[in-house]
Design a protein with these regions (language model features):
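N-terminal positively charged helical leader segments and presequences
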Residues: 1-68, 119
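RNA substrate-binding interface of SAM-dependent RNA methyltransferases
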Residues: 69-156
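Strongly charged, low-complexity linkers/loops
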Residues: 161-174, 179
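Structured adenosyl-cofactor binding patch, chiefly the S-adenosyl-L-methionine
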Residues: 190-229
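Generic beta-sheet signal
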Residues: 75, 157-158, 176-182
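Short secondary-structure boundary segments
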Residues: 107, 161-164, 184, 208
């Protein structure tokens, strides 16, 4: 059964669906009054709900709610925004499919694009979450500058750096809250790398090939999940 999204609470009885999803439900999926649909709130709950009113904003009545536990492993990607925004949006979409927990755009010395449209990325995340049939919505944080981020985030941090020979293995993963930092196409500056090492941030290589920023991020998510499963 297809999955839809609404930010409902578990004690709600009725849900009003937004206009875009209402249109898809009625026109694309040909649902009608009396039909049952599945809705997630992106916080681990999925409800089965009956359509009770059609219109621009359809209304549904919750019949049953199922709650799902999240994996213990939490992966947070701090990544430099890309000049080609479509490639960055592709990363956000695929990272959501892979079950990422958080994404933070970070501005480092060689970052070419300083701003991102958080609202648009939020819509991409919701769409990808529904498509991949997940009930937890990743958090997309506001843009942070490099120094502010590494000073205020408490996750175990690992930095991707082509200049090191350290390979990603289980020895680098000491907790269930991991933050992997991915720099822009030119990588992090020498000054940023030194600051990271002084802040006890580990550095790893992702191989001999020079990867695009978005490729490096997706590869890293997959590698971490493979090592911890």
């Amino acid at each position: 059964m297809d999955l839809f999204y609404s930010n409902f609470d578990n004690d709600d009885k009725l849900i009003t669906i937004n206009q875009i999803d209402s249109k898809h439900i009625i026109r694309s999926f040909r649902k009608k009054i009396g039909d049952i649909i599945k809705i997630t709130n992106g916080k681990g709950s999925v409800c089965e709900a009956e359509i009770i009113e059609e219109g621009k904003n359809i209304k549904v009545e919750i019949k049953r709610i199922l709650n799902y536990k999240r994996e213990k492993l939490s992966i947070h990607i701090a990544i430099s925004p890309l000049k080609n925004i479509s490639r960055f949006e592709w990363f956000v979409e695929k990272a959501t499919e892979l079950g990422i927990n958080q994404i933070t755009p970070i501005i480092s010395e060689f970052t070419e694009k300083k701003k991102v449209n958080i609202e648009r990325l939020e819509r991409i995340i919701i769409s990808s979450m529904k498509q991949s049939n997940q009930c937890y919505k990743p958090i997309i944080n506001d843009v942070k500058d490099y120094l502010s981020f590494i000073s205020n985030n408490n996750d175990e941090k690992i930095m991707a750096n082509m200049k090191t020979d350290n390979k990603l293995d289980k020895g680098f993963i000491k907790s269930n809250n991991i933050c992997l930092m991915i720099g822009p196409e030119g990588g992090f500056s020498d000054k940023e790398i030194i600051h990271a090492l002084e802040s006890n941030i580990k550095e790893i290589t992702l191989g001999k090939n020079r990867l695009r920023t978005e490729t490096a991020a997706i590869y890293s998510i997959s590698a971490i999940k493979s090592l911890t499963n």
